[in-house]
Amino acid sequence: MAKLTKRARLIREKVEATKSYDINEAVALLKELATAKFVESVDVAVNLGVDPRKSDQNVRGATVLPHGTGREVRVAVFTQGANADAAKEAGAELVGMDELAAQVKAGEMNFDVVIASPDAMRVVGQLGQILGPRGLMPNPKTGTVTPNVAEAVKNAKAGQVRYRNDKNGIIHTTIGKVDFEPVQLKENLDALLGALIKAKPAAAKGVFVKKVSISTTMGAGVAVDQSTLNPTA
């Protein structure tokens, strides 16, 4: 039997696999167990009561976290004219149309988020096979295809997270960094859960938010007692 690492032993000692922790206790555990040599992200997994095989029960969208994610986000915007000027003013690193598409085709993708105005989708549509597998394809449901590109850029820079349930009906995203204050992580999680509840499909029946777990980049998941959370709309 393989030897457990020091961190794995610590996790096994500290985290009860069958217990749901008060959010403050869960965050304290994550901070105690975060021993990596870099500032780890705090990730969340939310098990939803949906049937992901049915298109009318899939959950997808985006929300701005009140305290951001702690990440520097580089934004590329496909647009032109006055919208291009507005996107640059809002802080977008890359703005253009055909010339920006050529960069993407050449493999130059130094960005984390792609936004497009509706008139630019004729150009962006040609990049689906490149952007799609990377989760970068703009979509109206996540607010990344919009006539108001400046607002979309500001949202991305302010810590907007995009979410989409996987084939098991689970949402995976980040709610900050392990060096955030506990109250910041709680408020970010509350905001995310509020957005998910608001996005509940009409076809979804029964308990919608079934389980919430938080973890650090290198750590194990800690189940959170939902009664200690306060989802915000």
Swiss-Prot record:
InterPro entries: Ribosom_uL1_bac-type, Ribosomal_uL1, Ribosomal_uL1-like, Ribosomal_uL1/biogenesis, Ribosomal_uL1_3-a/b-sand, Ribosomal_uL1_CS. GO terms for biological process: regulation of translation; translation. GO terms for molecular function: rRNA binding; structural constituent of ribosome; tRNA binding. One of its GO terms (cellular component) is cytosolic large ribosomal subunit. The keyword tRNA-binding applies. PROSITE patterns: RIBOSOMAL_L1 (PS01199). Gene3D superfamilies: 3.30.190.20, 3.40.50.790. Keywords: Repressor, Ribonucleoprotein, Ribosomal protein, RNA-binding, rRNA-binding, Translation regulation, tRNA-binding. Binds directly to 23S rRNA. The L1 stalk is quite mobile in the ribosome, and is involved in E site tRNA release. Protein L1 is also a translational repressor protein, it controls the translation of the L11 operon by binding to its mRNA. Belongs to the universal ribosomal protein uL1 family. Part of the 50S ribosomal subunit. HAMAP family: Ribosomal_uL1_B. This is Large ribosomal subunit protein uL1. It comes from Shewanella loihica (strain ATCC BAA-1088 / PV-4).
